């Protein structure tokens, strides 16, 4: 059921003292809920995730397929079964109409641009969407301003994880046009990992000390863009200032 894809961080920022504790967390993307059958699938996913005992979960967007309030609420209910904190960011499909994210804001308040800390690590969740657009997008001025205002408040020496919906890896399909403007703001920080969605497929790219990844989708009624069939999520371990991760495949439910 598990297929391994371990990767070590390559470098550590000079002079940084890694946190002493280690912990695990899950990363899931592109669940695209659009019917009750998707709810049964997502509950199955959550039960498999519970076996891995992560301390929290990151969902990097496209929770639902068409931004409906009732679908977002259903995803919230399914994810609550994990019994652990779930931190999400908005995907383009989580908008109801081109620029309307009101349903997402109502169901998941304060989940646009934000930070949290865990085990000596810093986590930054960002909105990289351009409304409903899926290609040739730009990261909003509002997000870039938020980064400018809040990134200096973080400890540049402590390890940091960035999670956001649109793929930021160099050359990955649907990468926002102004990704470099965002990444340049993180160059002086101890960024160790970047988790993205939107492109349904496994990609891995370097950025300074970090590895930037996308993953296969974890949706019942959506496929992968890279032609693969596997659905699943990452289980990640933060230890000694580095991140490792492995892919947990979710098999189809019995007929």
Where do the protein language model's features map onto the residues?
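Cleavable N-terminal signal peptides
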Residues: 3, 13-14, 143
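N-terminal active-site segment of His-dependent metallophosphoesterases
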Residues: 7-74
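Extended active-site neighborhood of metal-dependent phosphoesterases/phosphodiesterases
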Residues: 17, 69-159, 178-193, 203-239, ...
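Short acidic, glycine-rich surface-loop motifs adjacent to enzyme active sites
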Residues: 154-171
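Acidic, His/Gly-rich catalytic cores of divalent-metal-dependent hydrolytic chemistry
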Residues: 240-255
